[in-house]
């Protein structure tokens, strides 16, 4: 029996005249994510994408795992594709669902008939197939309210598809449908989650990291590169920019008020990130993992001072989330265990003892203008390295 994966989408179906554009983006993403999994074919019809693995010894579970990380898909169904004949459905559907049914006590049948030319209506399909299942598995009982197994038959244009265990997709909209943004990627828990959340809303995510050797180690940089790699199954390939930041941090420590160190550092990071974006081209925004009030540098006053140095919009998708909520997402996307590895990053090595939580833009700008950072900013941008981190 031929197996096909049905990829169902949610809000894309509501995009009106732009729907086909979103579908095309999702097809491109699927082809990139599955390129190393083997041969396959992708078609689309009736607000569903059909992924058909080709060849022998195909690992359909591997296809399902990769597709579960494609934004835009809300449900994935591993299906047996049957001839649209009620006798074939009643014969083959119980066989396809046998593994699930053998270990169950109760079941129900759910039928969806989008092909209205099919001679049996949905209740009739349920009745016929339910009877066939009871004949083959007499230990089962019907429970339409809380069954152990639901056998679903979808009668569509070309085939009848049978499945038992749909899984949730990643949701959101396809990567690439909402522009391109630069993520300030530290070694912590929050910034990978912020990148994931923006990718889920269609942004192509690139990443920029600031390192401060010898105060930060090669292992710290490798940790951040590993985080970027862990993001690629969700976000796709990521350009990873690494900025040498030691000299600027030492100058800040020497020439600026200690209580404003972190805010001034973040302002200079934003300025460098924007210039790297200008140099790269076609990047519309910055992303940070800041959460309102989580630490002293993430008060509303501090964010206002940071944003005053920005020409580009700054997205903070974690801004209204508790730490526990951010951790839950980090665990889900597979970045948490790497994020908590105990390597210093440049944001922590020079942390002031008593950071100011209610700075004003005027005093921060005055402190920054007390020293000419411009030549050092230019040098940091020139010395920035870039690596393409690929998904698989």
Regions found by a protein language model. Name each.
Residues 342-344, 364-367:
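Mobile late-domain/C-terminal helix-loop "cap" segments
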């Amino acid at each position: 029996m031929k197996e096909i994966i049905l990829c169902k989408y949610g809000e894309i179906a509501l995009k009106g005249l732009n729907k086909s554009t979103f579908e095309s983006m999702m097809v491109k993403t699927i082809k990139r994510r599955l390129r190393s999994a083997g041969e396959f074919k992708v078609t689309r019809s009736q607000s569903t994408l059909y992924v058909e693995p080709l060849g022998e010894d195909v690992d359909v579970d591997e296809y399902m795992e990769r597709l579960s990380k494609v934004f835009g898909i809300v449900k994935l169904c591993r299906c047996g594709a049957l001839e649209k004949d009620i006798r074939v459905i009643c014969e083959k559907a119980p066989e396809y669902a046998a593994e699930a049914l053998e270990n169950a006590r109760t079941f129900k049948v759910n039928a969806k008939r989008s092909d209205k030319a099919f001679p049996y209506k949905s209740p009739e399909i349920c009745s016929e197939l339910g009877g066939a299942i009871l004949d083959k598995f007499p230990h089962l009982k019907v429970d339409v309210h809380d069954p152990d197994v639901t056998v679903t038959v979808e009668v569509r244009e070309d085939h009848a598809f049978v499945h038992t265990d749909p899984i949730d997709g990643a949701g959101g909209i396809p990567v690439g449908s909402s522009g391109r943004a630069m993520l300030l990627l530290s070694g912590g828990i929050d910034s990978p989650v912020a990148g994931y959340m923006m990718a889920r809303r269609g942004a192509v995510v690139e990443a920029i990291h600031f390192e401060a050797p010898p105060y930060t180690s090669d292992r710290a940089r490798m940790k951040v590169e590993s985080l970027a790699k862990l993001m690629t199954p969700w976000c796709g390939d990521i350009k990873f920019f690494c900025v040498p930041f030691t000299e600027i941090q030492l100058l800040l420590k020497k020439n600026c008020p200690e209580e404003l160190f972190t805010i001034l550092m973040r302002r200079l990071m934003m300025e460098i990130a924007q210039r790297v974006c200008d140099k790269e081209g076609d990047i519309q925004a910055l992303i940070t993992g800041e959460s309102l009030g989580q630490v002293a540098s993430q008060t509303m006053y501090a964010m206002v001072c940071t944003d005053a140095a920005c020409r580009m919009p700054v997205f903070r998708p974690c801004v209204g989330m508790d730490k526990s909520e951010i951790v839950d997402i980090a665990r889900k996307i597979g970045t948490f265990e790497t994020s908590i590895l105990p390597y210093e990053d440049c944001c922590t090595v020079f942390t002031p003892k008593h950071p100011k939580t209610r700075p004003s833009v005027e005093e921060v700008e005055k402190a920054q203008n007390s020293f000419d950072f411009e030549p050092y900013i230019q040098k940091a941008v020139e010395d920035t390295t870039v690596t393409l981190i690929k998904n698989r």
